[in-house]
Amino acid sequence: MSTIQYDMLYLLSCGVNKTKPQQNILEQYKSDDRKLMQLYWFSKQHFVDALTGTGLKQAGVTLPDPWEKDMAKAVRKVILFDAERARILSFMEQRGIWYLPLKGIILKEFYPSVGMRQMSDNDILFDEAFAEQVREYMVSLGYEVISFGKGNHDVYEKEPVYNFELHRALYGAAHDNNWEQYYRDVKERLIREEGSSYGYHMKPEDFYIYIMCHGYKHYQGGGTGIRTLLDFYVYLESLHSEMDFAYIEKECETLGLSEFEKRNRALCRKVFGDNAFAELPAEERVPDTAAHTTKEIITKALSQEELDMLQYYMTSGVYGTFDRRIENNVKKYSKNGGSSKIRYVIKRIFPGMETYQYYPFFYKHKWLLPVCWLYRLLRVVFQRERRERILREADAVRKVKV
């Protein structure tokens, strides 16, 4: 990790803790446009450029135009999503459809100001018995149906920015079976929103467990970026005193998340905590020397295992990477011995039944699965895009060290 990336972590800590960055850190970016653009690029890669940009701007740093525009777009996007979501939830209220806003819809409220917590979509769990009615309504609003009846959520998109993932279930057959069973009857654990007939929310502990579970899903898949760790910190910092950690630890143990939760709880506080950078040198220290202080402080505070975990977050980008997803999937097959690469290839050619949910006809008529295998093969042969993706996947598998 570069010193600029460590500075980014420091600025994120300042942003969520509402503290002004030290002047000797700011001077580096006021006087060096190249470093400022690198900081922007790293922040944008992790979808936290609105947060770092706001802190810099409030401290007197002049931002490049693209950064200013991204910050304005982040605020506008939240405002547009909030209004559109209110309309959709009003429809659900009128039709007697229970619903549960998820993920960023909730988390953004724990950040200091509008637009600081950026997101590309809105996720809502709803009563799947009304999926057809909801689809008709979304189409009437001008949405394109990107996906319907495949997996555990339906996807709707509309210009200029709208992307709604409407979940029939929190987890489905393609996910960990333990998670799918745990969340199958999630409505029984929900709390009705005050002033609403059909809107619900999770109690703080359950929401924390859910975002930890969601974070782990991405972490062990293609990876997930530093925003995930920041979300953990912001939520913990806001509600820590109210939460029952004995309950959290018990439920995380049930879900197989115990070690992941404990490591992240410690790591996020060490990286973003209010006192994480208390050892930064005094303002009179010269800028050239101060350039390395954020890196020194973090590397000193973390164990090697924690540094490795932080590095994993920092090299994953906001939604993970293709190569990392392939690597993690291949390594899953090494646990039981044998050639993990061969087992991975066989699984890709002859996938489990969860995959066939994306082929409704074959999922319904399972005796025709051999035809589906041939269909999948022919698509690779005759569709250039799929062929290129398979070649890229094969190259990624080849590079995996097991």
Residues of each region from the PLM?
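Conserved NTP-donor binding/palm subdomain of two-metal-ion nucleotidyltransferases/polymerases, i.e.
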Residues: 1-120, 126-402
